[in-house]
């Protein structure tokens, strides 16, 4: 089953800051919902263990993601795959673009496609798409919160 997702988020900081955060394993580990482990291997691949709940299915996915077509701080592509054991397998990619907005922040947009099989695919396209969108929204909400300028820092200067 193929799942298509796209989204757009406004972040309160420059493209350079957003791009750096999206390549920082500590930031990603903190912002990815259900992330239990995340490391950057010597070959540049991000390896992760993420606990997911998709409807009645709860599973741990072990996955690998590679960043490709790097154009800092404008864009890159993500390709990867994840194995959820008996729950199923997913493989896909996403294109991510960062554009400055009129207020000094960044407009982030993405388009993603994943191919899913196994028990997860039996849950149905609508449930998988809505759950995936919620996970993406939670990730970008966490990222936005992490990147918010700290008002106390500005006051203390």
What is each residue range found by the language model?
Residues 7-9, 35-36, 63-69, 92-100:
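Hydrophobic/aromatic beta-strand elements that line small-molecule binding cavities or substrate pockets
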Residues 2-8, 45-47, 60-62, 75, ...:
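Intrinsic-disorder/low-complexity, polar/charged segments enriched in Ser/Thr/Lys/Arg/Asp/Glu/Gln
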Residues 119-156:
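A conserved amphipathic terminal alpha-helix motif
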Residues 1-45, 49-53, 103, 154-157:
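Hydrophobic ligand-binding cavity/cleft-lining segments
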Residues 82-131:
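Beta-strand/loop substructures that line and gate deep hydrophobic ligand-binding cavities in soluble
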Residues 28, 34, 53, 57, ...:
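Glycine-rich, flexible loop/turn motifs
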């Amino acid at each position: 089953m193929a799942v298509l997702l796209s989204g757009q988020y406004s972040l309160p900081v420059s493209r350079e800051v957003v791009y750096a955060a999206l390549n920082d394993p500590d930031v990603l580990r903190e912002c990815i919902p259900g992330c239990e482990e995340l490391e950057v291997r010597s070959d540049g691949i991000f390896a992760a263990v993420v606990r997911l709940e998709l409807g009645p299915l709860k599973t741990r996915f072990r996955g690998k993601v590679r960043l490709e077509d790097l154009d800092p701080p404008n864009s890159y592509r993500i390709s990867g795959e994840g194995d959820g054991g008996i729950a199923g397998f997913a493989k896909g990619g996403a294109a991510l673009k960062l554009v400055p907005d009129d207020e000094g922040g960044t407009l982030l947009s993405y388009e993603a496609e994943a191919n899913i099989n196994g028990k997860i695919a039996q849950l149905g396209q609508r449930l998988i798409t809505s759950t995936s969108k919620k996970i993406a929204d939670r990730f970008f909400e966490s990222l936005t919160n992490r990147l918010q300028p700290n008002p106390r820092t500005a006051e203390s200067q």
